[in-house]
Swiss-Prot record:
One of its GO terms (cellular component) is host cell nucleus. The gene is PA. Influenza RNA polymerase is composed of three subunits: PB1, PB2 and PA. Interacts (via C-terminus) with PB1 (via N-terminus). This is Polymerase acidic protein. The active site is at residue 134. The lineage of its organism: Viruses, Riboviria, Orthornavirae, Negarnaviricota, Polyploviricotina. Its cofactor is Mn(2+). It comes from Influenza A virus (strain A/Vietnam/1203/2004 H5N1).
Length: 716
């Protein structure tokens, strides 16, 4: 069929048809019947217009080879065969100059004599059927329809055939010839059967009353009525060339598609400014634990009892002093708050029976740290809507921060192995169905790779802290409750261990809405000297509270112990997500699973065992300035887990925006790597959208710098 088309039709027509198909992502070599149909339709449109002119007196005349100098104007404007943007431009200018109503779909011709658009149809079926489908699709009184068939029949709106008998006969003869040529080559039957109807004829379904009003209210912008929107949706072709899509979406849009080459992308611009600071809800790599092994004390499992027991394992407490003040805070209050915690814990121990929870005295330092009475008084809107200068608070633009090296160190640390086991095998949930055998095997392998990982410790710590804080926020709304920060794990030998990281004191927590904030003060133990990277600890006041003896290869050394204190806040919805951090295990397991699936489909057998047990194989982990980093399958599991955990710990609007927008650029770059010749429009706008998310968030800035490494290496 393809050869027939190329022999049978004028090369210009063939070229236009190929272009039209390409615009809709169709291949003339594969969809040969469609190729033939498009060429036929184009040829009929050109024949319809050929030799028809309008003379100086605006009379319609037919000239086949007359005086080339006569002042003649073509009677028909050909719209079919132009690219969509150009075609709409022509339609728009005709409507503007003649005042004819603008059609909803691109017609084929415009008749300057009758002042109307014409839709030409060529059908291999019954002309009446095709005519009805066309009329139903374009739903316009203004556009004239003229249908031809390969059997010499025709049908036109109001039986007005526009052209003289002879011109129409020429078209019918040509169609008959094409049919015979196809039949003689054995192509006709397949061509005849391949014709698909226009959109099915739908009943007119009227919406009235309330539903109609709701429909009119909920239209997207720029649509005046439901009909107007419906026509747009009906006429929208769902696949094909992007220029065509854009010109369909809006007649005003004129996008130029630029090729995306290796030299096209530039690196993302990271912001300048002071280095970014730590903003997680609890310390990560800098946290220090006071631990008890094999806990068996009275009240074991009650957080306050566990905390007091852990505190007693340390003997190096000393008079606290401030070593790194908080720039904006009242630092003596932080110091007093810690002293108050120590004193009140001491009081508990002096009581006969230790209580299950501890509410702190509402001292001035805690009231200050927890922002008590700081919130502006809420006034009912009804009472103040007449105030003339009512306005929202002016809020400052966030200050730009530059990427600091500490966040990469944090990430590296999160990927490392610890010497404790943080999740039991059943943490991901038991099998339900018998088919789950392979899934269980994968889960067990994966769990073995990540159970010792520091990111898993962060998950369990996050789950514990958020659960405890949400519980306290609901159970003791008005109290300044003391909440120990605890985690539980097992040693390599399988012994149970309870760890204390520090304490939280929660403020008033009348949380009605998901986003209502509860303030808290966190006090966390650490051996990290804050003076080494003061920019990281901008939001903290750091005290030195003791000396710890550490065993090293050269014997025991004494190191100062610090307490990192800061005011922080969270909300019900954030705590809910924090409680569900175990989902990170599932997310990274699914990513690993898709890698195994890809491998298995190549080898045509389940590759789970080989995947995890072949220790010699390395896998790509990520990009760094040095190039693609590779590592063992365990390292891949832990890296994916750490990414998922950091997305949770450092969740923010900046991260949401960056992930969504940078993904577009990533897909374009991937397409270039796969030699798919991607094209783009408004690449500058995409860069702008990505870069407006690069403000001051450490995790987003790190991801942006990784993205730059990827761009540099991917497109070499």
């Amino acid at each position: 069929m393809e050869d027939f088309v190329r022999q049978c039709f004028n090369p210009m027509i063939v070229e236009l048809a190929e272009k039209a198909m390409k615009e809709y992502g169709e291949d003339p070599k594969i969809e040969t019947n469609k190729f033939a149909a498009i060429c036929t339709h184009l040829e009929v449109c050109f024949m319809y217009s050929d030799f028809h002119f309008i003379d100086e007196r605006s009379e319609s005349i037919i000239v086949e080879s007359g005086d080339p100098n006569a002042l003649l104007k073509h009677r028909f404007e050909i719209i079919e065969g132009r690219d969509r943007t150009m075609a709409w431009t022509v339609v728009n200018s005709i409507c503007n100059t003649t005042g004819v109503e603008k059609p909803k779909f691109l017609p084929d011709l415009y008749d300057y004599k009758e002042n109307r658009f014409i839709e030409i149809g060529v059908t291999r079926r019954e002309v009446h059927t095709y005519y009805l489908e066309k009329a139903n699709k374009i739903k316009s009184e203004e556009t004239h329809i003229h249908i031809f068939s390969f059997t010499g029949e025709e049908m036109a709106t109001k039986a007005d055939y526009t052209l003289d008998e002879e011109s129409r006969a020429r078209i019918k003869t040509r169609l008959f010839t094409i049919r015979q040529e196809m039949a003689s080559r054995g192509l006709w039957d397949s061509f005849r059967q391949s014709e698909r109807g226009e959109e099915t004829i739908e009943e007119k379904f009227e919406i009235t009353g309330t539903m109609r009003r709701l429909a009119d209210q909920s239209l997207p912008p720029n649509f005046s009525s439901l009909e107007n929107f419906r026509a747009y949706v009906d006429g929208f072709e769902p696949n094909g060339c992007i220029e065509g899509k854009l010109s369909q979406m809006s007649k005003e849009v004129n996008a130029r598609i630029e090729p995306f080459l290796k030299t096209t992308p530039r690196p993302l611009r990271l912001p300048d400014g002071p280095p970014c600071s730590q903003r997680s809800k609890f310390l990560l790599m800098d946290a220090l634990k006071l631990s008890i092994e094999d806990p068996s004390h009275e009240g074991e499992g009650i957080p306050l009892y566990d905390a007091i027991k852990c505190m007693k394992t340390f003997f190096g407490w000393k008079e606290p002093n401030i070593v790194k003040p908080h720039e904006k805070g009242i630092n003596p209050n932080y110091l007093l708050a810690w002293k108050q915690v120590l004193a009140e814990l001491q009081d508990i121990e002096n009581e006969e029976k230790i209580p299950k929870t501890k509410n702190m005295k509402k001292t001035s330092q805690l009231k200050w740290a927890l922002g008590e009475n700081m919130a502006p008084e809420k006034v009912d809107f009804e009472d103040c809507k007449d105030v003339s200068d009512l306005r929202q608070y002016d809020s400052d633009e966030p200050e730009s921060r530059s990427l600091a090296s500490w966040i990469q160190s944090e990430f590296n640390k999160a990927c490392e192995l610890t010497d404790s086991i943080w999740i039991e095998l059943d943490e991901i949930g038991e099998d339900v169905a018998p088919i789950e055998h392979i899934a269980s095997m994968r889960r067990n392998y994966f769990t073995a790779e990540v159970s010792h990982c520091r990111a898993t410790e962060y998950i369990m710590k996050g789950v514990y802290i958020n659960t405890a804080l949400l519980n306290a926020s609901c159970a003791a709304m008005d109290d300044f409750q003391l909440i120990p920060m605890i985690s539980k794990c097992r040693t390599k030998e399988g012994r149970r261990k309870t760890n204390l990281y520090g304490f939280i004191i929660k403020g008033r927590s009348h949380l009605r809405n998901d986003t209502d904030v509860v303030n808290f003060v966190s006090m966390e133990f650490s051996l990290t000297d804050p003076r080494l990277e003061p920019h990281k600890w901008e939001k903290y006041c750091v005290l030195e509270i003791g000396d710890m003896l550490l065993r090293t290869a050269v014997g025991q050394v004494s190191r100062p112990m610090f307490l990192y204190v800061r005011t922080n806040g969270t909300s019900k919805i954030k705590m809910k997500w924090g409680m569900e951090m175990r989902r990170c295990l599932l997310q990274s397991l699914q990513q690993i699973e898709s890698m195994i699936e890809a491998e298995s489909s190549v080898k045509e057998k389940d590759m789970t065992k080989e995947f995890f047990e072949n220790k010699s194989e390395t896998w790509p982990i990520g990009e760094s300035p040095k190039g693609v980093e590779e590592g063992s399958i365990g390292k891949v599991c832990r890296t994916l887990l750490a990414k998922s955990v950091f997305n949770s710990l450092y969740a923010s609007p900046q991260l949401e925006g960056f992930s969504a927008e940078s993904r577009k650029l990533l897909l374009i770059a991937q397409a270039l790597r796969d030699n798919l010749e991607p094209g783009t429009f408004d690449l500058g706008g995409l860069y702008e959208a990505i870069e407006e998310c690069l403000i001051n968030d450490p995790w987003v800035l790190l991801n942006a710098s990784w993205f730059n490494s990827f761009l540099a290496h991917a497109l070499k």
